[in-house]
């Protein structure tokens, strides 16, 4: 079994059929270094995988950290959105917002008070997500960014359980 590495894409494969690989495209029997692939010089020239200079490694690490932070932020937002969707459909939230605006314009205090609870609850959830995002953004390592969690148990328990049908009847 041979390890082959694509010289342009840095794809690594284990293969038993070395003759199937063109040596101008693939590095055959490559010794895979212990450093991350983002530190490899691309394209591979010659018979060895070379490491980028420190400045290029630092830039690659900074870009990697940025990507990992954004990925974690996206995961946290998805977690929040799934939790919100588990309680209210998007159309219900939009309709509740419309009813709240309409009630405010016509000074229907009871309806405003009822629907404001939902608006405040959604805002409270947004605050939790934004706080977690802030922790991710201030992280200096990938491990720190990935360690940030979002606990929505108390927030979900505080759901005002608003019904647009009930709001229309007020």
Predicted regions and their residues:
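A preference for well-ordered globular domain cores
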Residues: 1-3, 7-38, 42-170
């Amino acid at each position: 079994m041979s390890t082959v590495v694509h010289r342009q894409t840095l794809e690594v494969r284990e293969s038993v059929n070395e003759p199937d690989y063109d040596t101008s495209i693939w590095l055959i029997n490559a010794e895979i270094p212990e450093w991350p692939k983002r530190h490899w010089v691309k394209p591979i020239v010659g018979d060895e995988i070379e490491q980028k200079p420190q400045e290029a490694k630092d830039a690659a690490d900074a870009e990697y950290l940025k990507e990992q932070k954004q990925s974690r932020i996206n995961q946290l937002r998805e977690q929040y959105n799934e939790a919100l969707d588990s309680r209210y459909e998007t159309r219900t939230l939009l309709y509740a917002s419309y009813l709240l605006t309409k009630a405010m314009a016509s000074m229907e205090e009871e309806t405003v008070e009822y629907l404001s609870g939902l608006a405040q609850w959604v805002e409270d959830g947004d605050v939790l997500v934004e706080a977690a995002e802030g922790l991710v953004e201030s992280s200096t390592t990938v491990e720190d960014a990935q360690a940030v969690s979002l606990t929505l148990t108390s927030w979900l328990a505080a759901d005002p359980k608003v019904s647009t049908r009930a709001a229309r009847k007020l």
